[in-house]
């Protein structure tokens, strides 16, 4: 009994509730951590650059389309058709290129989240052990629980200490 109470007191001192079940918000865990905030800033910046690039391409293609429309009145159909087809191919190529860049950006975000959750596993295991809990459940999947079981804030604080914004870890993984 004394050992159990000592473990309970130790868990309480560490800011971890003593319970068999803990809850956590994985969305907040990522979004509110230094790692997640850095990734989200980078993705947003790359998305903004991509949107600006797309606007430039659309403006360029609009000018070309206007020129092509003006040429249509002056050229015989057999001369105009290859120009129109080449323009259509160019438009489709730009669309495909931009779509591929958006897909790559989404993949990068997913890969960063996957890496994050792999990196934080030891932190969550420590929380689990310190609390004496047997399971950590996604908070959004729980119908009703006490806020005492939510260790999201505690986990974020520990994650920030252990991996920070993760930039050095990601750089090492990319080398």
Range-by-range predicted roles:
Residues 1-7:
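Bacterial N-terminal signal peptides
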Residues 11-175:
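Amphipathic, charged alpha-helical segments and their helix-to-coil junctions
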């Amino acid at each position: 009994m004394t050992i159990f109470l000592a473990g309970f007191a130790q868990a309480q001192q560490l800011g971890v509730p003593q319970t068999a079940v803990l809850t956590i918000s994985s969305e907040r865990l990522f979004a509110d951590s230094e790692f997640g905030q850095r990734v989200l800033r980078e993705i947003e910046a790359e998305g903004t650059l991509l949107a600006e690039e797309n606007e430039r391409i659309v403006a360029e293609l609009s000018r070309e389309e206007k020129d092509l429309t003006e040429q249509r009145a002056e050229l015989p159909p057999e001369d105009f058709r290859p120009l129109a087809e080449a323009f259509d191919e160019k438009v489709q190529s730009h669309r495909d290129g931009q779509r591929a860049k958006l897909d790559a950006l989404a993949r990068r975000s997913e890969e960063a989240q996957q890496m994050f959750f792999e990196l934080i596993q030891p932190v969550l295991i420590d929380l689990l052990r310190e609390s004496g809990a047997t399971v950590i459940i996604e908070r959004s999947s729980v119908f009703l629980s006490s806020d005492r079981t939510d260790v999201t804030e505690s986990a974020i604080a520990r994650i920030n200490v252990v991996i920070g914004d993760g930039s050095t870890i990601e750089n090492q993984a990319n080398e």
